[in-house]
Amino acid sequence: MSDASTPLMRQYNSIKEQVPNALLMFRLGDFYELFFEDAVTAARELEITLTARNKEKGNAIPMCGVPYHAAEGYISRLIQKGFRVAICDQVEDAKLAKKLVRREITRVVTPGTAMDSNLVRSRENNFLAAVGRSGSRSAVAHVDVSTGEFRVTEMEPEEVAGALEHLGAREVLFPGDLPLLTGEDRSGLRFVRTELEDWVFTHDYSDRTLRDHFKLLSLDGCGLANRAAAIGAAGAILHYLRDTQRAALDHLDRPTYYDRADSMVLDSVTVRNLELIEPLFAADAGGIHAQPTVLGVLDQTLTGMGGRLLRQRLLRPSMNRAEIEQRLDAVGELQQQTILRAELRKQLSGILDLERLLAKVTLGSAGPRDVLALGRSLEKIPALKRCFDTQQAARLRNLHDRLDELADVASLILDCISDEPPLNLVDGGTIRAGFHPELDELRDLSQNGKQYIAQIEARERQRTGIGSLKVRFNNVFGYYIEITRANQHLAPADYERKQTLANAERFTTPELKDYERKVLDAEDKILTLEKELFSDVRKRAAAHAQRIRAAAAAVAELDVTASLAQVAAENRYQRPCFSDSGEMRIMAGRHPVIERLTEQEAGRFIPNDLYLNDSTDLLAIITGPNMGGKSTYLRQAALIAILAQIGSFVPAESASLPVIDRIFTRIGASDNLARGRSTFMVEMTETAVILNTATPRSFIVLDEVGRGTATYDGLALAWAVVEYIHQRTRAKTLFATHYHELTELAEQLSGVRNLMVSVKEAGDHIIFLRKVEPGKADRSYGIEVARLAGLPISVIERARDVLKLHERTEHAVSGELVKSEDHGPVQIQMFEPVGYGIAERIRAINVDELRPIEALQLLSELQKELKRS
């Protein structure tokens, strides 16, 4: 960085040294300016003009700038590109500054701490995470600065990458010397990595930092007793927030420890395959609520915090059966009470995002309209609470008790802030008339000046007898009294001459000068006083942060409960029940998303039953044609289990389920070129995770395992996977396949059953019935599906000919099924099939009559024919 000689640039350099890794936006009047390398970078990334300072002195300093009132948009663009941006503001009035205006960094915006609406979706969290380690244990803490949520958990080091991927953090804090994630681990993760000094993560420093901030004698009440790694990660987050936000952070929750074993585990592969949050083909979709996803079907929440809570529940279904049952009780009561549900949703629709409004208030970034929105939202809570004060469900009664009406905070805000405040405080009109007497007087002086001048003019005309006397104002002379030359002899002695014109004289008086001074000072005084009053009410509202946070959490849960009740009522969902028998019994189950799409297209979704248990029906092998509904059947079973454990009613006539600890899916295939993995490698890696991680309480969904390689290799692997799950894992499993040979396993393994997707043949055409029933399919109908896809008729006819020839000549692929000597898993005896024509020629040979030279010639011909085939 160049050594600039001016006081301004020395000030800039001094401040820039505080944030060497951030772009510094330096407030100069009505602009934020960037200098040196920051300017070059910003001009390139923002596509704005790069200029230079001090060109004429031969010491040009690159610079660029953006208007202060439009800065947030530019900051957002830089954050989206992964930059950190430090905001340096003028912290004293330029008019009062004796020399150089004092400037300070007021906040540092990073990907993990962004709050602007351009960067943070209303129904998604924006997480900042930190990774800590103590001994053999690792921890991941996360916070959403925009809502105050602050949580931490511990795990094994090898689990960190998966935890970060599932969390979806935008920025992650690491100790500089922590080699937790290898390149292989990190290659699928998308976050900004920020390294902090090692001492920030130490137990003693973090423990003290957390206790001091939250005013606690011990962290044991947060569940952090004897959890050094968790304390280090949580303390590092708080340290970083203090450094970047430069604010009180009163809206943050205490860091709460959560045990990952309390939730069903859904890894990123399962979340993607089941389309819980995003569709597999996002390019074909519009906005988040228009997308064909499970969240899109379930989310009828009316508040931002309710939408975020529903999303979190969907990603982390509960394993606490008592909690699930309480949620279902509440959903059931609201589902049955249509009028109550409608009134609740009406009241909820008037409540804005309390969590994010509160965050802005406590961080000091809330403008007049933000504070008014908070006040008006709090004003709605008493009416909301009155709606459900006689409910029976324990969860609803608990929510009612937790819902602080906050009428005092609402009055505090609404008594002060005007009904239509400006977007920016500097535009004036923020404070309500009648709230502050001095402010009212100043406004009266400023706004009613014309009336006051008219009164002076009338009085002076009467006093002097000059009917043409005028009181006027201009920017050069201010207020003045103008008298024509013919009447100047009538001017009173207290008139002071101010200006002589050709046809008139202009005067002033002590009263007029005093009024002029008051008027000119009034606007500045109004703005200063409004700033003081607004700042005061914002601080007083922030003092109630924990009360508001608690109320926001209650409103969010009520919103989610009402949303699930609404969805259940509209879509004929039924309450699931849970049992300890290990049985999974679903009657007339439906896929929530496909059902919705089918109804939109005036079609009818075909429901299906499912039965699995821990013994005789542990694993179902499902065969049938493409497009027959196998994948839908697999997914809907997994989704019904997930919906049940978030506390939702399910799309089925009835569902009796065990509490599942983890759902695995291996559906579809795609290359992962970024990691150098082929389709088959991705498939095998995902399958390996399932086999190595699943427990008897898990539910596994496998679709076409082995199809990414040669037929016999794929069949062998699929066969072995089924055996392994049946013999060792013992997890309930649905296994869809086109390897019809696998259906023979139902005769060999006691817990395997066959299911098939039925079709109806009509000549050369087929009708997909999409009904799953016991049995096994003997054909895949691939050619019929190809015909439906529009392949040329000549290709279809040729394919049928080849298929008939292949079916006549190919031996059974599975070969002979035998038991190993120790009665272990069934083995497949396979050999290369010999073409039918060659085999017939060999059978027809009369060896007794064949001469040696003829035998050699025949052997050569057969060899050539085999090579050609």
Swiss-Prot record:
Domain of life: Bacteria
Keywords of this entry: ATP-binding, DNA damage, DNA repair, DNA-binding, Nucleotide-binding
Annotated binding of ATP, by residue: G624, P625, N626, M627, G628, G629, K630, S631
Pfam families assigned: MutS_I, MutS_II, MutS_III, MutS_IV, MutS_V
Keyword Cytoplasm annotated: no
SMART domains: MUTSac (SM00534), MUTSd (SM00533)
GO MF annotation terms: ATP binding; ATP-dependent DNA damage sensor activity; damaged DNA binding; mismatched DNA binding
UniProt keyword DNA damage present: yes
GO BP term (any one): mismatch repair
GO CC terms in record: cytosol
UniProt-listed InterPro entries: DNA_mismatch_repair_MutS, DNA_mismatch_repair_MutS-lik_N, DNA_mismatch_repair_MutS/MSH, DNA_mismatch_repair_MutS_C, DNA_mismatch_repair_MutS_clamp, DNA_mismatch_repair_MutS_core, DNA_mismatch_repair_MutS_N, DNA_mismatch_repair_MutS_sf
NCBIfam families: mutS1 (TIGR01070), PRK05399.1 (NF003810)
Function statement: This protein is involved in the repair of mismatches in DNA. It is possible that it carries out the mismatch recognition step. This protein has a weak ATPase activity.
PANTHER family for the chain: DNA MISMATCH REPAIR PROTEIN MSH1, MITOCHONDRIAL, DNA MISMATCH REPAIR PROTEIN MUTS FAMILY MEMBER
Family according to the record: Belongs to the DNA mismatch repair MutS family.
Record protein name field: DNA mismatch repair protein MutS
Gene: mutS
